[in-house]
């Protein structure tokens, strides 16, 4: 909903808009292009798209993004690369979030990383915790380095 966009804007001070997807399970490059007409893109330094849906549908559609980042959370399980290979194959960066909860779940970080890299040897896999901030500096560094390459 537009509530999510407003929440992001309120918490970060960053302009945020909702892309209307007409009830589909994804956004695509055409939807993004139309949404960008609402933005002053001349002064835009970085655009982050949050696709919707699950680990299947969004992986099948090109959003027009330069890089794809996905989040896998520890509670979801280390088997997700086996169940949803395409999402991991098309991701440049895989963030394994909620790393601060590892002791409470049967999640093998190294096994998950191995499974991801088997599907996509070029992927970067980083452990993060949105709650504690662990690993977020590495994420920011990765984003900034990739941005410089454009």
What are these regions (language model features)?
Residues 101-150:
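Canonical P-loop GTPase G-domain recognition
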